[in-house]
């Protein structure tokens, strides 16, 4: 297309400016680890992660422009390129790998070693970048006018508005600072309860909220629509299904409860939470699996056309121009890198994958990297059905592995390892595409960005194993603190195919609930996640969504002012999410070390304190968005 060939980036190709410097690499690595760790914690708690590109861009612009008095937009862009890789790798890893810890907890196997987790993360991340590089010319350049890459374009807009970098960065840092205080008060000192709840004794239901800044921030960022669907899922679970179970079968024993323990005894011992843990979670898991499959089926025409169009574009070849903005990593480096990763996956004993598994990774990896890279350009990273791709991979790979004679826990571990690598490949390929779109608009050097992506992958890949081990040691997966919803689902799928005992009746209730939601045109995944996770958690997300609805719905404010205020709120919430994750990890370190800061025995403000703290958190969000003073 001529319009694409005539596109002029912000920094012309002939102009050479600072890009990969010691400053940009160090800052990028720090942000990759920070956002990777924070998103790992968030994803294991609520089943979703948030994009790190814009917060990383704002922080880098604020530090480089305002503090260091430098003026290099491409340097800031490389920081966010490296930094955002951490979030994407964490998203891929946490959806699958905690399943290995869950099996270890059940005594079926040993916990995965740090070497195993690190190698799986690194191989998946590196393959995600390398599989995407040959697609850059086809997707980013040739289809510049067609594929918008929403997050990549938005990130470029933020960097281009760099004169506000200092003010915007201060908003992110304010969110980080206040979230640290809130989190420390609740989970460190424990002077305010983590959740405020009210039980409906006659109904046998329960409602409440968790007093956490990150959940409020997630609700604000995803908006009222998604937050409300999640909350509806929780209402169905906690105020409809749990009361029905208690009403119709109080004296019944129902698998998977402990033998002989009736439903009424279970409720008497643990309340609605005990019924949710034993029964409703399986209904939610069935709904999540169905939601992922429905998402994949609905996307199938787009997936097929995406893969076909990408292959056609690649056949056209990329012109080996000498322009700085047209330089990619050399193809021989890419091919050698891909072969090296596949050999490591196959040959290293720490990764439980045989040659057949390595072949499946190559086939599914390249296919889903291609699909992910193009789909995020059309519908954005937030709507990219990575979980659906992971479910499809697990279904097929588990069937193939079982058919080859590899059964039992060894076969299940191999299936999860394959699913982990594919999930990370898809997440990283999508992130790389968004970052390269940002670079294309700004005039960055693709090769430099691709190296930056690899640096971010290595940095976060080396850290993710420690984060997963730490959270497991502190609280264990599958509980209230880190429920790890997607990993629990992947575990259930593999066990079901391999012949494990599952409460299939409960799972199929979730399946048909999800199908009903789809018929009603209610987005299945938010509803299913709400059904799977505790109502306290989703209620707080709903509160954040209501705040966003108020911000979006004001009629007496001009659109520019409203958009600026909403964006300030998003940046503040991104800071809260990042910092709560880091404080959570710090508290996990203290828990493992046996150090307690708990003073609740001396000072405890009870439920009233929780309500007051939630009001304070809402007011601080409004302070840095609605009531933020702009510089003249």
Residue ranges and their predicted role:
Residues 1-632:
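Alpha-helical multipass membrane-protein architecture
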């Amino acid at each position: 297309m001529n319009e694409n060939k005539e596109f002029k980036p912000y920094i012309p190709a002939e102009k050479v400016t600072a890009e990969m410097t010691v400053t940009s690499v160090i800052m990028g690595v720090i942000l990759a680890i920070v956002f990777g760790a924070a998103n790992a914690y968030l994803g294991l708690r609520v089943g979703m992660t948030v994009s790190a590109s814009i917060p990383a861009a704002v922080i880098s612009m604020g530090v480089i422009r305002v503090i260091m008095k430098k003026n290099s937009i491409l340097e800031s862009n490389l920081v966010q390129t490296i930094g955002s890789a951490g979030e994407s790798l964490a998203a891929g890893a946490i959806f699958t790998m905690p399943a290995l810890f869950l099996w270890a907890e059940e005594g079926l196997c040993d916990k995965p070693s740090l070497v195993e987790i690190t190698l799986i993360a690194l191989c998946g991340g590196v393959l995600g970048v390398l599989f995407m590089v040959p697609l850059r010319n086809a997707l980013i350049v040739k289809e510049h006018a067609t594929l918008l890459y929403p997050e990549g374009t938005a990130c470029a807009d933020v960097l281009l508005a760099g004169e506000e970098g200092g003010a915007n960065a201060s908003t992110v840092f304010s969110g980080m600072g206040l979230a640290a205080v809130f989190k420390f008060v609740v989970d460190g000192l424990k002077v305010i309860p983590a959740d405020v709840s009210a039980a409906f004794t006659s109904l046998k239901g329960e409602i409440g909220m968790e007093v956490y800044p990150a959940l409020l921030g997630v609700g604000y960022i995803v908006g009222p629509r998604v937050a409300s669907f999640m909350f509806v899922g929780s209402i169905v679970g906690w105020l409809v299904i749990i009361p029905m179970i208690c009403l119709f079968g109080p004296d019944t024993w129902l698998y998977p409860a402990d033998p002989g323990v009736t439903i009424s005894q279970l409720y008497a011992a643990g309340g609605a939470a005990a019924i949710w843990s034993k029964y409703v979670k399986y209904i939610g898991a069935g709904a999540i699996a169905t939601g992922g499959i429905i998402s994949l089926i609905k996307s199938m025409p787009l997936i097929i056309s995406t893969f076909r169009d990408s292959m056609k574009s690649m056949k056209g070849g990329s012109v080996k121009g000498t322009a700085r903005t047209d330089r990619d990593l050399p193809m021989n480096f890419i091919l050698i890198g891909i072969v090296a990763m596949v050999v490591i996956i196959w040959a290293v004993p720490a990764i439980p994958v045989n040659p057949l598994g390595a072949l499946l990774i190559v086939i599914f990896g390249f296919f889903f990297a291609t699909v992910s890279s193009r789909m995020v350009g059309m519908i954005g990273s937030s709507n990219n059905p990575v979980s659906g791709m992971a479910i499809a991979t697990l279904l097929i790979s588990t069937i193939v592995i079982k058919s080859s004679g590899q059964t039992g826990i060894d076969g299940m571990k191999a299936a999860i390892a394959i699913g982990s690598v594919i999930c990370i490949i898809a997440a990283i390929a999508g992130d790389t595409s968004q970052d390269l779109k940002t670079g294309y608009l700004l005039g960055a050097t693709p090769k430099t960005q691709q190296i930056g992506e690899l640096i971010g992958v290595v940095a976060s890949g080396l850290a993710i194993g420690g984060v997963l081990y730490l959270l497991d040691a502190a609280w264990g997966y599958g509980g209230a603190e880190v429920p790890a919803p997607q990993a629990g689902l992947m575990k259930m799928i593999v066990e079901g195919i391999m012949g494990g005992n599952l409460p299939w009746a409960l799972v199929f209730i979730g399946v048909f609930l999800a199908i009903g939601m789809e018929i009603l045109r209610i987005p299945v995944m938010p509803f299913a996640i709400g059904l799977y996770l505790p109502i306290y958690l989703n209620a707080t997300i709903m509160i954040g969504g209501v705040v966003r609805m108020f911000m979006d719905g004001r009629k007496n404010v001009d659109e520019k002012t409203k958009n600026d205020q909403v964006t300030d709120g998003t940046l503040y919430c991104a800071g809260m999410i990042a910092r709560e994750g880091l404080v959570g990890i710090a508290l996990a370190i203290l828990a493992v070390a046996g150090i307690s800061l708990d003073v609740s025995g001396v000072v405890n403000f009870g439920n009233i304190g929780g309500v007051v703290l939630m009001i304070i958190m809402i007011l601080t969000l409004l302070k840095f968005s609605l009531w933020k003073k702009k510089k003249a």
